[in-house]
Amino acid sequence: MAARLLRGSLRFLGGHCAARPLPALRCSHSGGEERLETPSAKNLTDIGIRRIFSSEHDIFRKSIRKFFQEEVIPHHSEWEKAGEVSREVWEKAGKQGLLGVNIAEHLGGIGGDLYYAAVVWEEQAYSNCSGPGFSVHSGIVMSYITNYGSEEQIKHFIPQMTAGKCIGAIAMTELGAGSDLQGIKTNAKKDGSDWILNGSKVFISNGWLSDVVIVVAVTNHEAPSPARGISLFLVENGMKGFIKGRKLHKMGLKAQDTAELFFEDVRLPASALLGEENKGFYYIMKELPQERLLIADMAVSASEFMFEETRNYVKQRKAFGKTVAHLQTVQHKLAELKTHICVTRAFVDNCLQLHEAKRLDSATACMAKYWASELQNSVAYDCVQLHGGWGYMWEYPIAKAYVDARVQPIYGGTNEIMKELIAREIVFDK
């Protein structure tokens, strides 16, 4: 696996690591002076050493950074206007090995560990390009299929998904059920060996481009509790009665397609059931820690990006005859931001280590998601303020980062719910 990663990364870089100069980066890592630094900030994460990455991860990171520089950043403004990215970039991502990096090689992945996946979503955050829904596709949808799918389902979907030819989405949220998944109304009723699916979903990331959607539906209205009567189904694009509504116009994440989905008497074969009947809520609870960790890592990475943008801006912006960076209030604010970001990075890295060791519990994942997403919004607010009026202009990267940040405390479970779950772990005995 390591040799394949190395060959693939060097091939994308044009045959050798130094094929094209990348931004000068200087933060500390373990393993030697030639290690690739992680964020774009000059000395942002010199909190010691990010020990979770090896030199192989760094080579992989270099190729992923180059991919975003060449295949995503130049097109992102166009995608924002369209409200979706091109399918072409999905297939290019598949060829580069960005999709399902921790999937086994015989299924089209590269057999990497969690840290390879983290490299991909961190580099997307550093690119400030939120359009491609790679993290939902790889970190959430593919995880459900590989963990709970049958051998036939895995063989049918995963190779196409790692190639970027089949785009995945997951449909949980409804008009009357967001964080309260037990309140969903979408239902599936048996008809012989088939299922008949009815209902609707909203705010579905990758919904418009999706080829397969994991749909959360009620399958047993007589269950002792709603949680015991929920199942998951794999619904494919083109099935009769599966209708994609409009692309939703959002405050941020403008290039990421988000859609309404409708299911009107969709006939599903028995093979569309993902996992066991009525076990859907259990599966969701098992997968949510990874989703929340993903959000947390992208949040702190976005914070690192915003800090670097702002640090560079205040060092060249002049006011009162000197650069803004020479004002004590600005210096103190930068000191606060850097400290908060570095502390959060250390916590999130620890959570990544816990998850790789299969020891990340729900409450800790909730803490990471809650804290990092709140930090991201705080950093976004302060960085726009330090940009002054220019921070309110869309052509400045900080403006886009600001509106993209706002949804982070909402999806993956609102931060209010995160606090409830954390408190429950503290107060009540299991």
UniProtKB/Swiss-Prot annotation:
This is Long-chain specific acyl-CoA dehydrogenase, mitochondrial. The keyword S-adenosyl-L-methionine does not apply. One of its GO terms (biological process) is long-chain fatty acid catabolic process. Pathway: Lipid metabolism; mitochondrial fatty acid beta-oxidation. It is an enzyme of class 1 (oxidoreductase). It comes from Macaca fascicularis (Crab-eating macaque). Substrate binds at residues 179, 227-228, 282, 289-292, 412-413. The modification N6-succinyllysine is found at residues 66, 81, 165, 240, 254, 279, 322. Pfam families: Acyl-CoA_dh_1, Acyl-CoA_dh_M, Acyl-CoA_dh_N. The active site is at 291 (proton acceptor). Long-chain specific acyl-CoA dehydrogenase is one of the acyl-CoA dehydrogenases that catalyze the first step of mitochondrial fatty acid beta-oxidation, an aerobic process breaking down fatty acids into acetyl-CoA and allowing the production of energy from fats. Keywords: Acetylation, FAD, Fatty acid metabolism, Flavoprotein, Lipid metabolism, Mitochondrion, Oxidoreductase, Phosphoprotein, Transit peptide.
